[in-house]
């Protein structure tokens, strides 16, 4: 009996060992399977990351994260600055600068200030009415050309007077006909008149322009029209031609006897 019990115990021990030995193997197998699965998951995650980088989705997600973070920071900044009331004023200033109303208001303010200062200057000690009227008259005369016409008329009248005085006082009595035929007499007369007119104009500028009343002769509009048409210069030329013709006839009459004496002597 003892041997039988001993044999049964040995068999039970063997059976127990056979049942207990596969258990560790299954645990190891399960662990290896889990490790393999984890490695496979890690590999798949890495493949997904690589794929996301290649497709740009990872960068997009990162950009979205940064945008959301900036939005949160901006909202927080708005909440902080809104309490102080500076946001509304700054936005209003920015809108005014963008629309140009700020610059317009500054310009309007400067214009109003300049107008006020100008009015104060006129009230306190501005230029007198006589100075303003004289300046306006001078500007109008320069713009219309009457000032230049007066200078031209003065020079022409002065030249005519000097030419008449020269003919009366200093007319040469022994002049050859050849000078009139060659034109040298006319050239000398022109040079003399130009020199005399230049001298008189310089003296007129130094001493001061004489005052003349044009209402007795012609109106300003008529004088401008005559200068523009050239009729005034034509009248002066006619007067000079008539005077020259008269003087030439007198010269011919006075020198006729002298020429006859010369011919008889020859």
From Swiss-Prot:
**Which BP terms does GO give this entry?**
adenylate cyclase-modulating G protein-coupled receptor signaling pathway; negative regulation of apoptotic process; positive regulation of insulin secretion involved in cellular response to glucose stimulus; protein kinase A signaling
Localization in the cell: Secreted
User: What's the encoding gene here?
Assistant: gcg1
User: Which stretches are tagged as biased composition: Polar residues?
Assistant: 23-32
Q: Which InterPro entries match?
A: Glucagon, Glucagon_GIP_secretin_VIP
Quote one Gene Ontology molecular function term. hormone activity
Name of this protein: Glucagon-1
Question: According to the lineage, what is the superkingdom?
Answer: Eukaryota
Q: Which family does it belong to?
A: Belongs to the glucagon family.
Alphabetic keyword roster: Cleavage on pair of basic residues, Hormone, Secreted, Signal
Q: Which residues form the propeptide?
A: 21-50, 84-95, 136-140, 175-178, 213-224, 261-266
């Amino acid at each position: 009996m003892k041997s039988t019990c001993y044999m049964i115990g040995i068999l039970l021990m063997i059976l127990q060992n056979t049942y207990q030995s596969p258990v560790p193997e299954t645990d190891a197998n399960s662990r290896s399977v889990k490790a393999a699965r984890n490695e496979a998951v890690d590999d798949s995650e890495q493949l997904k990351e690589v794929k996301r980088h290649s497709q740009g989705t990872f960068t997009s997600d990162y950009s979205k994260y940064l945008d959301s973070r900036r939005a949160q920071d901006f909202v927080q900044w708005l909440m902080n600055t809104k309490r102080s009331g500076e946001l509304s004023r700054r936005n209003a200033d920015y809108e005014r600068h963008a629309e140009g109303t700020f610059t317009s208001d500054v310009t309007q303010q400067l214009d109003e200030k300049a107008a006020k200062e100008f009015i104060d200057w006129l009230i306190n000690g501005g230029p007198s009415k006589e100075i303003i009227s004289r300046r306006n008259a001078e500007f109008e005369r320069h713009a219309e050309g009457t000032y230049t016409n007066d200078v031209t008329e003065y020079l022409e009248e002065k030249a005519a007077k000097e030419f008449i005085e020269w003919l009366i006082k200093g007319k040469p009595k022994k002049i050859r006909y050849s000078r009139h035929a060659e034109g040298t007499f006319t050239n000398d007369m022109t040079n003399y008149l130009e020199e005399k007119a230049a001298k008189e104009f310089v003296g007129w500028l130094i001493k001061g322009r004489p005052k003349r009343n044009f209402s007795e002769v012609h109106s300003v509009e008529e004088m401008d029209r005559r200068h523009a048409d050239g009729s005034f210069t034509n009248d002066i030329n006619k007067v000079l031609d008539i005077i020259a013709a008269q003087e030439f006839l007198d010269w011919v009459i006075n020198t006729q006897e002298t020429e006859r004496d010369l011919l008889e002597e020859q």
